[in-house]
Amino acid sequence: MTLKLNIDTRSWRNHIKELHEEFPGLVPVAKGNGYGFGLDVLAREAARLKDDCLAVGTAQEVAKVRDAGWSRDVIVLNPWRPFDETATVLIDDPQIITVVSRLEDLDELRKKHPRARVVAELMTSMRRHGITPEEIESVDAGSLGFEGWTMHLPLKGQLAEAKQLASAAIAHHRGAVWVSHLDIGDYRRLRTQLGVQTRMRMGTRLWLGAPQALSTTATVLDVHRITRGTRYGYHQARAPRATGRATRG
């Protein structure tokens, strides 16, 4: 009696394939509950498509996608912090790319894990975390495997912001540019203007962007008629009108 997600596999996979063709350098994101599909399902789909890199949210999710059969590179999107023991254990894994968002963390990794693969995160208008434009010139990767620069843009990606930040970053240390939330036109313009490898992280648009391929079903256990003003549910809200309340399994 559980809620079930039903997938029109052919339609869903066609959508995913089309996005891979439209966005060269696409990196699938598999994090949290796997956008409702499960991390194992997404890891297997990425492997089926022969993607070279999979993005996860946290270091703890690496084992889950590997258990599902993923055997290529993994970038951990949560920036590394010294207190994260799981992330620290993974740093020297040659297939792990660690995101670094503070100069002091970059310095520590350079000293203690000189062969680690890292991506430097830039501060955007999201104001989450990242190296500020003023700090870019202080970035010293040393012997680290520098995999480029990453930025987390607002849902409506800002091409001008992405170009400005990326241009300043690659002028200091040339490398790939990892972005999110740009539409296809802006992404192609950015690729052309920067002249470096670009990677597009994609989660929601990739996995949930074909709603016609998805449907849900559930078992209805009871239907109760309630009158206007009757309290119901955990929060005891009042019914705005006479209606039926379904209880599903």
Where are the regions that the model predicts?
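Active-site-proximal beta-alpha core segment in soluble small-molecule metabolic enzymes
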Residues: L3-I7, S11-R13, P24-A168
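Active-site anion/phosphate-binding pocket segments in diverse small-molecule metabolic enzymes
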Residues: L5-D8, R13-I16, P28, W80, ...
